[in-house]
C-alpha cells in the first residue's frame, strides 16, 4: 500500500508539472501573438506618418528642381512666329501693354496682338513721344513738349496740356501718373489721375531740395518717390524723397514722409519693384521697403563703371565694361533684397537690355 501511495503521488506530481508546463507554453504563445500585433500596429502608424512626409519631400524636390531650372536656364535661339513690314521704322517705338504690343510714334498709338493684328488705334500730335507702362496702364509724354496722353488696354483715357515743358512722366498700376515739368528757375512735379485730372502739384527749387532727376510711383498710387540732385560745397549730392498723398502724409511738411541724402553720389534713375523701391546710383543701388513710409533696406556698391541697368519686380541687373578681349561685358543680377543671384561675362554688342516677360531672360537688341 505504501508503495502504491508513493507511486500515485509521483504520477500526480508529474501531471501537475506537465499541466504547468502546458499553461506556460500557452501563455507564451499568447504573449508572442500580442507582441506581434503590437509590432504590426507600430509599423502601420510609422507608415501612416512616413507616407505624407515622403509625399511632401517629393513635392519640395520637384518645386526646387523647377525653380532651379527657371533660374538657371538660358535661351540660345528663337523662332520667328510672325513678321510685319513697317514703313516708318525710325520714329515708331514699341513696348508691352497687357501682354500685347504698344506701338507709338509722333502722331499715333496702337495696340497690336501677337498676330500683329491692330486691336485699336488713336491719334495725337507730339514731337518726341516717350512711353512709360505699368501693368495695364500707360502714359505717353512729349519730352520737352507740353502734351501727355494716358491710356489703358482699351485706348486713350485722358489727355493733358501742361504749362511747362515735360522732363519725364511715370505711371502706376492703379493708373495714377506723375510728371516732372521744367519751369526754368523752378520745377514742378504734378500728380494726375488716368483721366488727366490734376490731383496735386508740387513746386521745387533747384537749391532746395534740388533738380528732380526722376520720379516713380508705388503700386498703391499713394506714395511717390523723387530723386533730386543738387550741389553742396562743390560736391554733387543726391536726395531721395518719398511723398505720401494719403492720410499718412497729410500732417507732414510737403507730404514728405521719409528722405535720404547721399553725398558725392548721382542717382539718375529710380523705380518701384513691387512693394520695394530702388534708386539706381552711379556706384550701385539702394533698396527701400515700406508701403506707407519707405525705409532704407540695403545698399549695394560696386567699383566698376555701370553702363546699363535693367530690372523687373524680382531682379535688378547691372552691366559693366569688361577688360577681357573675349568678353566685353559683365552682367550682375541681384534679388530685390540685394543678394547677388549670378554674374556672367558676355560678348554680344547691344543697344538695349531688359528683363523679358517670358522666363525673365535678358533680351538684347543687336547693333
Predicted regions and their residues:
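N-terminal targeting leaders characterized by basic, low-complexity, disordered sequences
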Residues: 1-29
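Hydrophobic membrane-insertion alpha-helices, especially the h-region
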Residues: 51-68
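Aromatic (tryptophan-biased) beta-strands that constitute blades/sheets of beta-rich domains
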Residues: 73-90, 113, 117-126, 156-162, ...
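Repeated scaffold domains used in trafficking and secretory/extracellular systems
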Residues: 87-96, 124-136, 163-175, 207-217, ...
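Structural motif
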Residues: 108-110, 146-150, 185-191, 232-244, ...
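Structured, soluble extracytoplasmic/luminal domains of envelope-associated proteins
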Residues: 119-173, 297-300, 307-314, 318-325, ...
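Solenoidal tandem-repeat scaffolds enriched in leucines and small polar residues
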Residues: 187-280
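Residue-level detector of conserved catalytic or cofactor/ligand-binding positions
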Residues: 358-367
